[in-house]
Amino acid sequence: MSGHDSKYFSTTKKGEIPELKEELNSQYKDKRKDAVKKVIAAMTVGKDVSSLFTDVVNCMQTENLELKKLVYLYLINYAKSQPDLAILAVNTFVKDSQDPNPLIRALAVRTMGCIRVDKITEYLCDPLQKCLKDDDPYVRKTAAICVAKLFDINAELVEDRGFLEALKDLISDNNPMVVANAVAALAEIQENSTSPIFEINSTILTKLLTALNECTEWGQVFILDALSRYKASDPREAENIVERVTPRLQHANCAVVLSAVKMILQQMELITSTDVIRNLCKKMAPPLVTLLSAEPEIQYVALRNINLIVQKRPTILAHEIKVFFCKYNDPIYVKMEKLEIMIKLASDRNIDQVLLEFKEYATEVDVDFVRKAVRAIGRCAIKLERAAERCISVLLELIKIKVNYVVQEAIIVIKDIFRRYPNTYESIIATLCESLDTLDEPEAKASMIWIIGEYAERIDNADELLESFLENFPEEPAQVQLQLLTATVKLFLKKPTEGPQQMIQVVLNNATVETDNPDLRDRAYIYWRLLSTDPEAAKDVVLAEKPVITDDSNQLDPSLLDELLANISTLSSVYHKPPEAFVTRLKTTVQKTEDEDYVEGSETGYPEASGNPVDGAASPSATTGYVTKLAAAPAPVPDLLGDLMGSDNAAIVPVDEPTTPSGRPLPVVLPASKGQGLQISAQLTRQDGQVFYSMLLENNSQSLLDGFMIQFNKNSFGLAAVGSLQVPPLQPGASARTMMPMVLSQNMSTGSTSSVLQVAVKNNQQPVWYFEDKIVLNALFSEDGRMERGTFLETWKSLPDSNEVQKEFPGITITSVESTLDLLAASNMFFIAKRKNGNQDVLYLSAKVPRGIPFLIELTAIVGQPGLKCAVKTPTPEIAPLFFEAVEILFKA
């Protein structure tokens, strides 16, 4: 509708539906067109005009393109609520798809794809097949996108009617925009499918690189994103691909630049020549710098992506730190991101410039920005040992300014510097103590108390300083109370004189008798028992040498960083979270006929395993939690548990609660004898491509239990709950079963890989219950773990022999190959091939755990005889024991 059509939105008439109905059936074309515009205007502002469906559909029979577009718009909006009437429009769609005007042909097929009604999809197939082979490229490119929409509605239909093959044929089209749309459609379908659909080989690669130079900017983005998923066969091929893509770095469109950077970064992993890598780093710097002269919103997205890039390849922007200096008119969100990148790029060569900038920022008016700047100085000190003294000098200068929040932030970071460089800069403690009276923030108080306790033997009046804090002990936040407790114990152990003895009695009494905080009370009891039984042991525990803290400027886990770099220029790279952490994507598996499912060249002809087939509509199990109960749904539980174990889980979100079958018995993780009558059984499970924590809570106590909350500690796989624990109030003798959706790679722990999952559960009537569960890989194996035979062999050969781990299971008996493969397929371990070795059967399978870690599996057994030998090859052999645990659990279940 054009600008002068705004009059259609300004009507205030009542009872206009009958009038519109009359105008829609007018014999005059102009009157009908005006009536349709009024209907669209009413629909746009939220009025219900669905009663005019038949009358509007009758207006489709027109040669007027504008009117046809308006009617199609109405159809898209109301077809779902009027599916039976929408069928009336099918004949016109079919007729329009054969119209001489290519615009009308494309419009018809585009609209049919947008109408998400199952009854219409069957009728869409024939016109769509014709449009995919249309003479006009505009029609073909529109039809390509329509295939992706149809796949979302009915994946099986798309497979059966050969649309995927037709889409792949369009990659060879002579029109670059058709190629780009075909690539976009195939990429979309691949993201929502468990089976390999869009795999780029050398032939397709050549066609895409050719089309790249000729298609529009958004077409280039689609092609570059597809190319970034291609794994070159050798360094030479990777160099050739990068050479063809490098000119895109000069493009005016920011999306094209970022997609080109993503693609180049992925291929650089395979390039071995240091000269080539150095030249590529030089070429990528100017376009990334140019992004910072765009609008603030684009700058922010660019900065979030650059943050990831400099963690992987800091040399790209090592000499460009000045472009990240904050301007006076930068929005706060841009300034904050620039600070982060400056910390990452800080080096011994440029630290003086950086410190001057940070010092200037620390005198600005925005409190949050000032705090971040002061903290940045501390992080630079921790990162650069040779610059630490200069950083401390700047912090001391800032403390002398006597601005309260600057002083407090400086004390917080100086505490970290003391941890990083013990027994080096303690001479400044006297200066810090001068600001003692101004501290009013919990973190600053806790930091100052830690410093006093840690260096009590060097501070003459340490007992007086701590006593000044103890006056308000009951009113202090938990963070300060905990630190005061520990600092007082340290003081007593270092100076066991009369003053500290009296202080320790007061503190322990307050912390055990006067408090409701279980953490504080438990720690106080531990100290009390240590001091009363063995003071020397207490010294060994409390005054033990602490590990030196390290630089946190590259804080992302390397595997998570690689995943985020593969998603540059998407929301994932802005959130710094993997897609599955904030998007629940439904994976669709196309059911094939029995003949199609056999592995080519397989000796057994055993079908490859696939995920559970689901309909095109979203399955509730993919997106929601489950609760089986009799009572009505409770209100969402607030996050009172908070940061129970130091983890940083996402905000709690209420979870829907459809019912679920009770399922098989779950292992008990908290027996009633330890839980004051509360018994919890739980286990990680997988359903429809989603990991759940399945729980059964039983109230064997004599009182009502309600207000249940849960928290997961940091763990090796980053498992965290998506929502709050939705459990109804449990009467005595009652029980409830729930399935909590989980995400991965969000709550990562450091150190060696462990299968331990530490959980805390709380309710309104009882203390916090801590228990340990086991992370079983069976629940983590993803649906996209199937490998082609050639890929399996290539990956097996590429991994060193040291990555192969073997284990024998003498107690496991294979009764039949087929039942074994069925069992493994149900846990997403996919059959590749089989061979005979004498009287032994050797099976080859593949599986994949989160972050794309593959497992290449070889099982050897004699059917009917005890004994199973399992060999696994993986890039991360340290988690092989967890894999063997999963295999044993699977066969013994």
Curated annotation (Swiss-Prot):
InterPro entries linked: AP_beta (IPR026739), AP_complex_bsu_1_2_4 (IPR016342), ARM-like (IPR011989), ARM-type_fold (IPR016024), B-adaptin_app_sub_C (IPR015151), Clathrin/coatomer_adapt-like_N (IPR002553), Clathrin_a/b/g-adaptin_app_Ig (IPR008152), Clathrin_app_Ig-like_sf (IPR013041)
Superkingdom of origin organism: Eukaryota
Keywords: Cytoplasmic vesicle, Golgi apparatus, Membrane, Protein transport, Transport
SMART domains xref list: Alpha_adaptinC2 (SM00809), B2-adapt-app_C (SM01020)
Membrane topology: Peripheral membrane protein
Cellular compartment(s): Golgi apparatus; Golgi apparatus, trans-Golgi network; Cytoplasmic vesicle, Clathrin-coated vesicle membrane
BP GO annotations: intracellular protein transport; vesicle-mediated transport
Stretches for region Disordered: 593-621
Keyword presence, Nucleotide-binding: no
Family: Belongs to the adaptor complexes large subunit family.
Entry-linked PANTHER family: ADAPTOR COMPLEX SUBUNIT BETA FAMILY MEMBER
General function of this protein: Subunit of clathrin-associated adaptor protein complex that plays a role in protein sorting in the late-Golgi/trans-Golgi network (TGN) and/or endosomes. The AP complexes mediate both the recruitment of clathrin to membranes and the recognition of sorting signals within the cytosolic tails of transmembrane cargo molecules.
Complex formation: Adaptor protein complexes are heterotetramers composed of two large adaptins (beta-type subunit and alpha-type or delta-type or epsilon-type or gamma-type subunit), a medium adaptin (mu-type subunit) and a small adaptin (sigma-type subunit).
Protein's name in the database: Beta-adaptin-like protein C
Source organism per UniProt: Arabidopsis thaliana (Mouse-ear cress)
Gene: BETAC-AD
